[in-house]
Structure formats: structure tokens, C-alpha cells
Amino acid sequence: MDHGIPANPYNPHAWIIGEPSIGPGTWVGAFTVLDGSGGLAIGAGCDISCGVHIYTHSTVRRCVTGRACPEVDRAPVRIGDRVFLGAHAVVLMGVTIGDQAVVGAGAVVCSDIPARTLAVGVPARPTARVVVDGSEVRFEPLHTAVFS
């Protein structure tokens, strides 16, 4: 059955717009939206969980002006190597997520996430440092000063 989603090499149930750069070994789950219309680079070895949406454009100004502002805003998204995006996370235009970062399920990423950082919530906020030691991974809580 044809569901109307253009074919792509990652997942038959992922909607990929434009021509994003996706590194080797990256896994893309079902029901994802990868918007490459404003420039999207996803590094190697990432997991983009089911239901993740990554946007590189916004039609807010066009919409609220009744189309008096005809432009669609666009800004690239950059995702580093070995980044995990949890189920149903949303990444908004203009964001950079550093290498080995972890974004929790349902998080909405509106600003940059540093490398090796766990970010959760709406909006996504850094809560822990990701420490990788061989095959072991641990999350070291950040001090509350990060939220001020």
C-alpha cells in the first residue's frame, strides 16, 4: 500500500524532506520527520528514535501575518556523532547538538545542547553530564547553577 511518504534509505515510515546529510551507521526510527529544507546534518552512529521531528524551518511569521510576510524562516540544524534522540523528541531550527549527547523522550530542543550532555524536558534543559568509559555509560548530575 502506498502511504504517500517518499522512499528513503533509512526507514519506509520516515518522512525525509530535502537532502539532509546523514552519517554512516545512523538509525532512523519509524514516524520520524527529518526536515532538511533549511540544512540538516546528522553525524555518524546516531539513533533517531521513533516519532522524532527535526525542523529546519518555521512558518510562524508567514502564518500570523496572514501571508503579508511571505518568507519561510530557515536555519540549519547540526547533530554531532553518536547522539541519541529519545522517542518523540522535537528539535527546532537553528539548534546544534554536540557529540555523544542524549536527548530524553518527549523533549523539545529550542537551544544548543553541548557535547556529552543529557537534556530533558520542555524546553529541553541540561541535567547531567554523559560519561562514557568503554562500554559503560553513566550520567553525572549537573549542579543547579545550570538552570539559572
Where are the language model's segments positioned?
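Outer-envelope exported proteins of Gram-negative bacteria
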Residues: 43-45, 49, 100-106, 116
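Flexible, glycine/small-residue-enriched loop-and-beta-strand segment within the central core
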Residues: 9-22, 28-96, 122-123, 128-138
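A transmembrane-helix-recognition feature enriched in membrane-embedded lipid enzymes
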Residues: 1-8
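Beta-rich strand-turn-strand
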Residues: 87-111
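Conserved active-site beta-strand element of glycosyltransferases/polysaccharide synthases
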Residues: 119
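Short glycine-rich donor-binding/catalytic loop of glycosyltransferases
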Residues: 106-107, 112-114, 124, 130-131
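Acidic/histidine-enriched, glycine/proline-rich intrinsically disordered or flexible terminal extensions
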Residues: 135-148
